[in-house]
Amino acid sequence: MAEACRVRRMKLGSQGLEVSAQGLGCMALSARYGAPKPETDAIALLHHAINSGVTFFDTSDMYGPETNELLLGKALKDGVKEKVELATKFGFFIVEGEISEVRGDPEYVRAACEASLKRLDIACIDLYYQHRIDTRVPIEITMRELKKLVEEGKIKYIGLSEASASTIRRAHAVHPITAVQIEWSLWSRDAEEDIIPICRELGIGIVAYSPLGRGFLAAGPKLAENLENDDFRKTLPRFQQENVDHNKILFEKVSAMAEKKGCTPAQLALAWVHHQGDDVCPIPGTTKIENLNQNIRALSVKLTPEEISELDSLAKPESVKGERYMASMSTFKNSNTPPLSSWKAT
């Protein structure tokens, strides 16, 4: 059985950022996975996370949009902010509550940062990610503005999310990248080919989002069957019924292995991510304190090399049917930017 354990600390990247070895993805408290949770319940969960040793919180200006940052601003008042490492993101330009485009131009980078600081009610963001890459703007241009924000004391560390290996390398040459956020789990392993190696070559921390396959590795096909109509996952290829029928086989195999191991499927899947290296920090999200407690206990699940190998063999690319996102969504696979020489500021 997975035991209660203390959440260890880890160095994320090479610039000095220290975080809890498991973070908390905050998106579902406000958006995308059904109706927003009551504010008092959400704040109680955030405070419980801190008291349990999970202090690395992940949000974005597009969660809500904006309401998730406002929630965290309220939850972290009265000195609570000093106990956490707070990451937020920019990049999705929102018009009337809907994503209009991805932007990485200097004017927008600065405006987005200042708006996030105001909503979060803080003077400096610990880790500021470009949420998605603007493929019209050379990454060097975006990074130069982020570097200025570091120099001005508005952000401490810079991160990228869903960026290609070449984009990461070019960005890192302008200013050190502290962390790259990428989907990484037993059912999303395509980052292992190029993204993980470039991060390790450059000393960049790896933040694994959706380490439980957006909940599928915790609840299996019944999750897909019971999604609310306004749940973002209903639109994702992997949650369509024809793909769920295939993907449930992976869940069943993980469940059987977890039963033998004396832990839950979610804990086994999360433990696999934790075992990928000391430079990896998964950020599972949840809206329930009990699930948070269960996720923390995954840190106590020790996997042998043979068990890791068995999980690797279960989670081959052919084990999962359906793309991670709709074709229109920006990911690291379509995130290369024009050469710097092409840029003409307007």
UniProtKB/Swiss-Prot annotation:
GO MF term set: oxidoreductase activity
Location of the active site: 63 (proton donor)
UniProt keywords, alphabetically: NADP, Oxidoreductase
Family designation: Belongs to the aldo/keto reductase family. Aldo/keto reductase 13 subfamily.
Binding-site positions, NADP(+): 210-220
Sequence positions that bind substrate: 131
Oxidoreductase found in the keyword field: yes
Organism the protein comes from: Arabidopsis thaliana
The name this protein goes by in its record: Probable aldo-keto reductase 2
InterPro entries documented for this protein: AKR (IPR020471), Aldo-Keto_reductase (IPR050791), NADP_OxRdtase_dom (IPR023210), NADP_OxRdtase_dom_sf (IPR036812)
EC assignment: 1.1.1.-
